[in-house]
Every structure is written in structure tokens, then in C-alpha cells.
Amino acid sequence: MGVPIVVIGAGVGGLTTAALLSSNGHKVRVLEKSSKLGGRTASMVFRNHVLDNGFHIMPFYKKSAIFSVLKKLNIESHLKLAKVNDIAFYSADGFHAYPKGILDLLKLSLLPFKSRLKLLRILLPLAFTSIEKTELWDDTPLTDITNNLDSETNAFFESVCMLAFADTADHISLGEFARTIIRANPFKGGTSEFAYPDNGGYDSISHVLSDYILSKNGEVHTLQSVKKIIVENSRVTGIVVKDAGGSEQLIPANCVVVSYPAYHALNQLFEKNIIDDKFVQKINRLNKTTSVIEVHFALKSKIDSRQVVFPVGDEYVTKGIFFISNITPSVSPPGEHLIIAGTPVNPEITDDPNAIKSIVDKMRNEISSIYPKFEPELIWERPMAWKLVESVVKEPGKVWKSKMPHQIPGIDGLFFVGDSTVSYGIGTDSAAHSSILCSPKIESFLKS
């Protein structure tokens, strides 16, 4: 079988690529620098609750890129999924059902009827256009079509962007937004359904993929930090790895797949002058981050039967409340309930403990105003302030084909996957899509 293909990173992008290659009989070795699988989706157990590293969700359910990979591998039954379909808005006059399709917009009680018609006039052309045409809008901000809308309709767009992109509308490419609307349109073969692993922890997806790789005699190693990719005469010849004990080892390799942000890899893993400086500078512009403050709350009882609630309006700091235990009770011990609330923030706030505390206090107070039982039922809270890298998949001028290519011209045996590379979709769906696009290129190289 020869020298194994080396995949750097055990997130969704790396593991879907490794699994697809394993399914075709290739020997694969996955190296992950942390102690856990899943990359940014790695979960943890805290006081017997399963906490995700932020709120993760599988968009488009069985139409998602992740599910299509599992289906191709014939292991979709290995991942039991819970539907996420009980979603609502909350405004000053109460709760309003989230539209599950284009036609549901006519029944959207959140908006006056005239606003619903305006919304349909915007969304219908997007929903029925082609993926190819959306590329014309990739450099255009979504706000170009929302700026002149009334405040209620703008608030609707903000909530949709929070669910789909975990960000505000001014950071979203119109092209990426349109592709999301197309893929949610059942008349175009899409679905607006979402899903979450029924056993709890979004990294369950990564563990299913890892198990498949191991079943095909592949290898998955944690605590293995790749320090260098060696390129000689325009070909990959090996990697230098540091293990948990601190010792370095040279591993021969003629095919290496990098599955963490390309703009980091280009600056960290190669000797100077291996990669053209202009190319590196071009990719470095993709290094844009969105910062988020999120808080897990554990409660003594259920305060709502819904799964997701979006407070609507500029007066709310809290942009989303996710009732994880209502999606699947497996994330919590018996008799307790887990929710997570979050809001995007400026990056500098994540380094300011006082600012973090102030925002957490505001979110707690807002949830209490919506749910009077919240404070009396609260057991504990666990704030998190962190920076995302997946914002690169949604900003104008930094989406779809403007992202890092899967190969660098002139270097054989080197490939890049993940949501920072050519792909579209939301978060991990984008990472899996990149694997679907890149895997045939790797196969072609291996046959050459």
C-alpha cells in the first residue's frame, strides 16, 4: 500500500477527507495536535453536562455535505440525529414561529403583512436562482438589499444570519446568503431542516468518521503536532512531527493534506521561499475572525419546550438562546436542563474580563425578562469568550471560489481542505463540502 497519506488535523474537514480516501483503499494517517478529535467542534463534560465549544448545528439535515459523506461511506446509520425544528422569535409582543419555508413567510406574525410581501420580493428571486448566478454576488454585502427595509424586517434578517452564520448581516456575503436560501428551498431539492447528534456533543460526527477510518486500517493519532512540511524539488517528501513527549520525528510522505486554516499553515509549516510571498499575502487576507461570547446555563427544570429562540431587536444583547436539552436530553444528567446563549462581539472585548462580565450579566437579565422562572431555576453558568475562524466562509469577497485553493500550483502532493478553502456552506458543512471537492483531486494525484 506504500507510504500513508498524511492528514494534518482531525476536524470535520480532515476526517471527512481521510474517510473518503480510506473508502477507496488508501492507507491514511491522521495527526491531531490536541488531545481531542473534532477541531473547533470538540466538546467537554462539565458537571455531567456535555458542553459544545459554542453552538454547532448541522444545516440542511440529510441534504448537508456532512450527511452526503456519511451516506457515501454507508455509515449514515452510525450517527443518530435529532431534528432541530422548533424555532421561534421573541419580541416585545411575545413569541412568533420561525418560518420553515418560503411560503411560511406569508404567515410570519413577527412582521406586518406589507413587510412580509417586501420580504418575499427579496427572497423569492434568491431562492429560485442558480448556484452559478450567486457567484456574481460574492463580493456584495447582504446589507445592500436590506438597508432600506423597516426595522422589524431587518431584525428578521439578523436572526436568520445568527442561526445560519452565527454573525450579523453586515458581515455576510449576499452570494453566500443566497446559496443558503437555495439549499433551504424544497422546490429546488433543498431543506430548511437542521439536525444535531442525538447522543450529544457535535464532535460525535468526528468520532463516527474516526471509527470508520480505523475500521479501514487507517490511523488516527492525537497529541501529534506537525511542525514542518518538507518540500523538495517541488514535491512533498515528508513532515516533521513533535509528539506529546516533545521529541521530533521525520516521517516520509509523498501526499499531505492540511485541514486547518490555510492562512496559518502557509505561515507556520513551510521553509521560507517554498511558497510564493504574493500567494501567501493573498491568502493572509482571509484571516478574518468573528468573536463571540457565549454562556452555558444549567437549570433545575425546563423553562421552555422550544429548541431555539431568537430575541429580536437592537435592544437585546442576546442574539440566540439554544435549549440543548430540548434538542436531545442526552447532554444533561437526569432532572437538569442545559441551554446556551450567545452574541457576537468586537475581538478586543474577549480580552477584557470586565466587558465579558457586563455582557454576561445583560444576557442573564434578558433571559430572566423573557422567562421569569430562569433565575430561580439556575444551578450554574459557564461563560466563554472565544474567536472563531469560520467567519472566513461568509464575508463579502472571501467566500466560495475566493478562498484558498485546494492545491498550490507547482507543488505536487500538497492539498488543503476545510472551511477556509474553496467551498460553500455553513461552518462544518463548508468543511465537508471542501473535502467532497478536493478528494477527487487527491485521487487523481495518487493515480498519476
Describe every region a protein language model picked out.
Residues 324-448:
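Conserved flavin/dinucleotide-binding core of flavoenzymes
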Residues 92, 107-183, 196:
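Rossmann-like flavin
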Residues 183-247:
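Helical element adjacent to the flavin cofactor pocket in flavoenzyme catalytic cores
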Residues 227-337, 405:
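Mid-domain catalytic core of redox enzymes
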Residues 22-47:
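Glycine-rich FAD pyrophosphate-binding loop
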Residues 57-62, 134-138, 188-212, 353-359:
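Short beta-strand to alpha-helix junction loop
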Residues 49-131:
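Dinucleotide-binding Rossmann-like beta1-alpha1 core, especially the glycine-rich loop
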Residues 3-30:
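N-terminal Rossmann-like FAD-binding beta1-loop-alpha1 element of flavoenzymes
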